Amino acid sequence: MGNTLKIAVPMAGLGSRMRPHTWSKPKPLIALAGRTVLDYVLAQFDSLPKSLQVEYLFIVGPNQREQVEAHMSQHHPEKVVHFFIQEVMRGQSDALYLAREHLRGPLLMAFSDTLIETDLSNLDHIEEDGLAWVRPVEDPRRFGVAVVNEAGWVTHLVEKPQDVSNNLVVVGFYYFKRSEELMSAIEEQFQRNLTLKNEYFLADAVNILLQRGARMRTRQVNVWLDAGIPAAVLETNRHLLDHGCGNSIEAAQREGVAIIPPVYIDPSARVQRAVVGPHVSIGAGCVLEDVIIRNSVVDTDSQLRGLLLSDSLIGRQVTAEGKTSQLSLGDNTWLKE
């Protein structure tokens, strides 16, 4: 692999399924296990060979760049990031095509609300033209699947298949050895107007590549996490805390707080007369007093008092008092019962 590796992350979606949280921030900046979804998306690439030069291509919506750019400058200043604005939501292929001037040579593409665990340490020795990461599921009809022949090569991708015998669901993580060939396939996709509900899906461009003779294999993953809806964010938060992303030992040293691991409590948060856990993430600058909370995520600078909380997502700078048992509050909300 002689070229700089580009990593494209389309994130321009409106995040309507994550409202009210996405009224004020892009979906990738939703809090999750002490960090943000975007931080964990970037962590997927930690196993890349250190010899590779990496540049990121972020395709964002018209009102998202400022917050995402500020987050990257503060938390990932060492990363080279190019931004592209997708003014109209016309799908994955359209998003990638916006970055075409930067796309020569190898490309990784990952969705901004999906997390997987995979080893990328040998990516600089890949002989195939492409890779699609997959996971077997019981019912693949809601997803896209990769059809593989007896020799292990991908023959084509199928969106929302009716035949459930093929259950290798594509998890939204791809590698292309020559991204310029993908751009050419996307151009043909545009010319043929291959759309689904007025969106250009990447699967159609991949099928064009395969029809042209590209050789693609699959890689299976055991962990595939979603952060696209509130229930999935809480489930992903549980998984991450269960697998070492918390700080339960440090949190247990706080006075006046009962900790039920696993949890993450930012060192700057003030927690008094509280029972925290299991599966709770509390961000920087938060204040929790007289609170019992479990299976919840609380973003930065929020104040919670006198609450019994479970299965809740709390945004930034939220003030809530009372006895409510389940909340989903976006940023800058005030609630008193």
Please provide the spans of the model-predicted regions:
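Conserved N-terminal catalytic core of the sugar/cofactor nucleotidyltransferase
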Residues: M1-A12, R17, W23, I30-A31, ...
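Active-site glycine-centered loops adjacent to acidic/histidine catalytic or metal-binding residues
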Residues: G13, D113, P136, I229
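Hydrophobic packing residues within well-ordered alpha-helices of enzyme cores
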Residues: M18, V68-M72, L182, I186, ...
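Conserved beta-strand segments of alpha/beta enzyme cores
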Residues: P28, V80-H82, W153, R215-R217
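A structural signal for short hydrophobic beta-strand segments in well-ordered beta-sheet cores
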Residues: L29, A146-V148, T218
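Short internal beta-strands
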Residues: L57-G61, V134, V297, L313
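Conserved core of the sugar-phosphate nucleotidyltransferase
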Residues: L115-N193
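Left-handed beta-helix
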Residues: E188-E337
